């Protein structure tokens, strides 16, 4: 069996990959969201040419092929290439799941079942009281027992979204959500070490348990300093996609919790490797999964399989009113939350079906054996 055709269906925000073998078997994957039309072009220029005609073994064993692409395209290291490779990786995992009539979770040592979530707010343009109303409503209606909200401004160079917002939202949500709800915050690379430490100690007094990306993510020594000065867990790694960076991060003990993103990393295989390296260092893995696309589906499968899975699956609380591009991507409701959990079903592959109407309205490209 070999790969015969690679098709992409894209818009500015999202791009799906359809992989077809010479036997007519099909797998569906996705490249990382945002500027996905650009990523699709990279896919057909720099990923698909190496993959058309690739002979596939009976069981998943294509990690070396992904590395080969990276080596062949060594003049183009970084995020865009790996975002494109993620489309191939995730399509192959879906293919193998369907060939073996198993969910991807079962192929990687996990199993179907429930996965606990934390509700992840993506908004900073919202007052603490308005955010409290949203999160308390989700707590009461969906049984969600952990939430993450935003402090500082994104890459804010030590500036708040507006003056005093960070301290206020910590105080308001800590009080309103109650002691039985786990409270996590995300700084999105905002703060200097000094400011992050000051805010972190304030948050410790308000029951916050997780401080994500407190300093510019590329400044590992700054993040490590914050980790060493605080009692709460410092998390990071969502932006990192290079294995040497991950090895350095883990050797230097920069964070308490690692957060690779399946789509930024180049797919499931490479994310599993980060999780394995973190496990060797005794660190939990709580991957980044910040929207309701295939990234969240892939991540819930992953969390059933790794021994160092974090407490929760990141689960965006933003629907199509905030992210219109998420509307009607899949048939059914693969993101249904019951009592604070989502489910990995027994359906083969990723267990989702992409909406045909969405595909018909996308931009199409193909690479195939002539």
Report residues per predicted region.
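Glycine-rich, aromatic-flanked loop segments that form ligand/cofactor-binding clefts
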Residues: 89-125
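Shared catalytic-loop signature of beta/alpha-barrel
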Residues: 49, 60, 207, 218-341
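Structured beta-strand/loop patches that form or line metal/cofactor-binding pockets in enzymes
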Residues: 1-28, 32, 321-324, 328-329, ...
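Conserved, mostly hydrophobic/aromatic
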Residues: 24, 47, 88, 101, ...
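Metal- or metallocofactor-binding catalytic centers and their adjacent structured scaffolds
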Residues: 20-99
């Amino acid at each position: 069996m070999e790969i015969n055709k690679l098709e992409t269906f894209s818009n500015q925000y999202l791009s799906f990959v359809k992989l077809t073998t010479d036997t007519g078997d099909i797998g569906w994957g996705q490249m990382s969201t945002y500027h996905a039309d650009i990523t699709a072009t990279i896919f057909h220029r720099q990923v698909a040419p190496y993959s058309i005609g690739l002979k596939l073994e009976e069981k998943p064993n294509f990690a070396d092929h992904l590395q080969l692409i990276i080596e062949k395209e060594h003049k183009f290291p970084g995020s865009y290439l790996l975002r494109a490779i993620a489309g191939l990786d995730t399509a192959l995992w879906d293919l193998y799941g369907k060939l073996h009539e198993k969910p991807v979770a079962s192929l990687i040592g996990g199993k179907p079942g429930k996965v606990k979530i934390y509700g992840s707010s993506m908004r900073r343009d919202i007052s603490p009281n308005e955010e409290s109303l949203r999160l308390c409503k989700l707590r009461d209606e969906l049984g969600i027992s952990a939430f993450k909200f935003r402090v500082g401004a994104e890459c804010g160079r030590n500036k708040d979204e507006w003056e005093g917002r960070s301290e206020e939202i910590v105080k308001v949500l800590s009080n309103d959500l109650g002691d039985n709800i786990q409270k996590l915050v995300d700084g999105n690379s905002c703060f200097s070490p000094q400011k992050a430490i000051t805010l972190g100690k304030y948050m410790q007094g308000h029951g916050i348990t997780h401080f994500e990306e407190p300093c510019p993510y590329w400044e590992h020594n700054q993040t490590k300093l914050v980790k060493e000065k605080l009692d709460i867990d410092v998390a990071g790694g969502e932006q990192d996609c290079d294995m040497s960076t991950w090895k350095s991060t883990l050797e230097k003990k920069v964070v308490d919790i690692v957060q690779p993103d399946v789509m930024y990393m180049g797919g499931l295989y490479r994310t599993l490797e980060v999780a394995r390296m973190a496990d060797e260092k005794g660190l939990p893995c709580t991957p980044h999964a910040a929207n309701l696309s295939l990234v969240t589906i892939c991540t819930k499968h992953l969390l059933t399989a790794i021994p160092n899975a974090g407490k929760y699956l990141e689960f965006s609380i933003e629907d199509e009113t905030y992210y219109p591009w998420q509307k009607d991507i899949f048939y059914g409701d693969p993101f249904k939350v019951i009592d604070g959990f989502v489910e990995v079903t027994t359906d083969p592959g990723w267990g989702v079906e992409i909406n045909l109407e969405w595909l018909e309205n996308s931009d199409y490209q193909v690479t195939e054996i002539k």
